[in-house]
Curated annotation (Swiss-Prot):
Disulfide bonds: none
Transmembrane helix among keywords: yes
Subunit structure: The cytochrome bc1 complex contains 11 subunits: 3 respiratory subunits (MT-CYB, CYC1 and UQCRFS1), 2 core proteins (UQCRC1 and UQCRC2) and 6 low-molecular weight proteins (UQCRH/QCR6, UQCRB/QCR7, UQCRQ/QCR8, UQCR10/QCR9, UQCR11/QCR10 and a cleavage product of UQCRFS1). This cytochrome bc1 complex then forms a dimer.
Name the record gives this protein: Cytochrome b
Subcellular compartments: Mitochondrion inner membrane
Amino acid sequence: MALNLRKNHPLLKIINDSLVDLPTPSNISSWWNFGSLLGVCLTTQIVTGLLLATHYTADTSLAFSSVAHMCRDVQFGWLIRNLHANGASFFFICIYIHIGRGLYYGSYLNKETWNIGVVLLLTLMATAFVGYVLPWGQMSFWGATVITNLFSAIPYIGQTLVEWAWGGFSVDNPTLTRFFALHFLLPFAIAGLTLVHLTFLHETGSNNPLGIPSDCDKIPFHPYYSIKDILGFAMMIALLAALALFSPNLLGDPENFTPANPLATPPHIKPEWYFLFAYAILRSIPNKLGGVLALAASILVLFLIPLLHKSKQRSMTFRPLSQILFWALVANLLILTWVGSQPVEHPFIIIGQLASISYFTIILILFPLASMLENKLLNL
């Protein structure tokens, strides 16, 4: 009998074990679609990004014009640019839902997978930040200036570090060229980390909504989940196309239609919507170093989540107290996102400070307390 190539070929075997014959829990819901959707986002961003890079010029005197030229004179350049810019938003929507899913169902107990996931989030944030600078509009320039300047809060080495990152004494041509280099490189680092993320995931297998071992009831990934994933792909691509075609500038900043001018500061400097929650936490502390530490902590706190798991149950499915806290955390992040987009004045300052305190309180204090209380109430 002939060997089955799919199961025996050195390369096809890897693909087969990851996408075809992968044993998968029979009860995972659509919340498990977002991992593969992130793969689609990454592929889309790399393809559109490569096409944009062929027409882009990383020079302060030409960057803005090269982007304008792309939108006017390159075949479908406007579409490629709009897909790339809005694709970033979909990337973040998917990764935030993916992290929320992991938090709700206790997937973070696969520690290696979770920790690499957090590193992936940090890399994605870095990629999006350096990419936002490339069109060299007003908000690109001032966003880069404000955020890179935060490193100067690091004691002793801060100022040297910032000037080293800038390649001079302000954000200028050397900064733009190195940001382009980084923006080109990092997505491939993300792709590499994704493979490591999946390698660790396939060591343990996927979690499921009940948070219980499912080895006794596994089904093959293909055709059951491959077809389910394709539905997710179609829905996301349809939404991305709708946004890119009907309202491509909905999530952008109008300041970026003005070329960068170091002599004129925009009235409200703010990042893209997906960074606003962290920006609100940064702004809520009236001290530079304190703000930078809070900003870092707002993401790095994810590394602590596996250590703060005190419940005898893995998932929140049967834990109503933790569920209330989880949705309070989601609401809190939405409030932080809204506050981050508002000017620094009353009442937004105090709302931002209260929301920042609640963010850390819910994660670091209330989640473990609720878990221990639930254990007690259920006599576990």
